[in-house]
Amino acid sequence: MTASLERRESASLWGRFCDWITSTENRLYIGWFGVLMIPTLLTATSVFIIAFIAAPPVDIDGIREPVSGSLLYGNNIISGAIIPTSAAIGLHFYPIWEAASVDEWLYNGGPYELIVLHFLLGVACYMGREWELSFRLGMRPWIAVAYSAPVAAAAAVFLIYPIGQGSFSDGMPLGISGTFNFMIVFQAEHNILMHPFHMLGVAGVFGGSLFSAMHGSLVTSSLIRETTENESANAGYKFGQEEETYNIVAAHGYFGRLIFQYASFNNSRSLHFFLAAWPVVGIWFTALGISTMAFNLNGFNFNQSVVDSQGRVINTWADIINRANLGMEVMHERNAHNFPLDLASVEAPSVKA
């Protein structure tokens, strides 16, 4: 009888825990994805802050030339970064217990791998938590689908690209100038500006910003006034009201006359689907582009495409970009390579006696 009561009590304890985890009445929804999300994101954030402040220099290129990234080792907010794991480690899983000492782990850039892997797991769980909360509330799942775009982009630069290049040392550093360095080196080695998927991503981000500004300004400019001229239009509304706060017909009429009739949406669902889909699809394509360039399927190469009747090259912008790429590649890892890989890969002319 005692065992039966204990079992029933423990079952109810587990049941109460499950109810609390999945309750939509909590101020912040936890969910089963949150059970994994919270510790992983807390770990990634804590280690990032500590390492950004105090981590010793990291031998990123594996050539015994450590690079400083933390504030206590001479950096500021702009130049500071979490330096990627050493090329000597490559793609090996490198937790603290795999190193001979904590000093060795820090020297080889162990914190970068720890932060990145916990962060990716955490943001993936955040996406799952968005779906889970939508499901509990009877909503459709598109919020999580939209969030998949930045998750895919993060996975591309922190995981897929290092896998394709063979080392976590090629991942994006976790800092401002480190991000710019990653972008410059990526352009030098993969010609990303000439990749159509990157072009689609640029159109998605800039187009999304434009459409967001247009939509917000149109809505704000076509509010249905519920107040007199002597008080703010904002005073005529309450949060969560069922009635529409703006006149979409007026906004449609304005924009249709500003551009032309069919450039404007007169259906709210179509409009908001477009506003969500445009940047999301663009960022999906960018993530896909990074993931293909990770395996060296690079941007278009139009170098020396135009020649005159004598066979002399007439430079185009493609050749100017190529020269810039070579210059950037020369400066990258300057002590690890004697000259750019593009030049090193050219077959030497045969010398006959």
Swiss-Prot record:
The listed locations are:
Plastid, Chloroplast thylakoid membrane
Q: Where does chlorophyll a ChlzD1 bind?
A: H118
Q: Which CDD domains match?
A: Photosystem-II_D1 (cd09289)
> Which parts of the sequence carry Phosphothreonine?
T2
Supply the NCBIfam families for this chain. psbA (TIGR01151)
UniProt keyword terms in alphabetical order: Acetylation, Calcium, Chlorophyll, Chloroplast, Chromophore, Electron transport, Herbicide resistance, Iron, Magnesium, Manganese, Membrane, Metal-binding, Oxidoreductase, Phosphoprotein, Photosynthesis, Photosystem II, Plastid, Thylakoid, Transmembrane, Transmembrane helix, Transport
Q: Which GO terms describe its cellular component?
A: chloroplast thylakoid membrane; photosystem II
What is the protein's species of origin? Angiopteris evecta (Mule's foot fern)
The membrane topology noted for this protein in its Swiss-Prot or TrEMBL record is: Multi-pass membrane protein
- Provide the binding site for [CaMn4O5] cluster: D170, E189, H332, E333, D342, A344
Write the protein's name.
Photosystem II protein D1
PTM comment, free text: Tyr-161 forms a radical intermediate that is referred to as redox-active TyrZ, YZ or Y-Z.
Give the multimer and partner information.
PSII is composed of 1 copy each of membrane proteins PsbA, PsbB, PsbC, PsbD, PsbE, PsbF, PsbH, PsbI, PsbJ, PsbK, PsbL, PsbM, PsbT, PsbX, PsbY, PsbZ, Psb30/Ycf12, at least 3 peripheral proteins of the oxygen-evolving complex and a large number of cofactors. It forms dimeric complexes.
Chain coiled-coil ranges: none
Q: Does the keyword DNA-binding apply?
A: no
So where does this one cross the membrane? 29-46, 118-133, 142-156, 197-218, 274-288
Q: Where does chlorophyll a PD1 bind?
A: H198
Remarks, miscellaneous: 2 of the reaction center chlorophylls (ChlD1 and ChlD2) are entirely coordinated by water.
Primary localisation category: plastid
